[in-house]
Amino acid sequence: MTGSRETEWLDVHRGDAPLLLCFPHSGTTIPDALEADFVSPWLARKDADWWIDRLYAFARDLGATTVRTDISRSVIDCNRDPSGASLYPGQATTDLCPTGSFDGEPLYRGPTPDEAEIARRRARYFEPYHAAIASE
């Protein structure tokens, strides 16, 4: 099942096996309204987990449920703690709405997302993604 118009970036395939696979970083879509904010289209997409959803496509044939976002992790990283707590203490990580790449390159041409923009992206993308996981 692909999401509604409001969640067309969210793909949920419901299987019948007790296995759930989530792909929070396979997306490369940047909403049109945000594209020009980034230094370059490539830089905003390069930290994706390229083709990971295809690598695990066989799991659907085994009955697995899969949840995938098509939104680039540079827009919002659905695998980050919204509180800012590091998932990997001592290692390079990015924020919920990253402002730089893992190589330390700035992602934005100008101002970075403020609290209101982060809250908007969280409500628009992060929360529906996690609600889809929780419903499984």
For each of these PLM feature ranges, what is it?
Residues 1-136:
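N-terminal catalytic or cofactor-binding beta/alpha core of small enzyme domains
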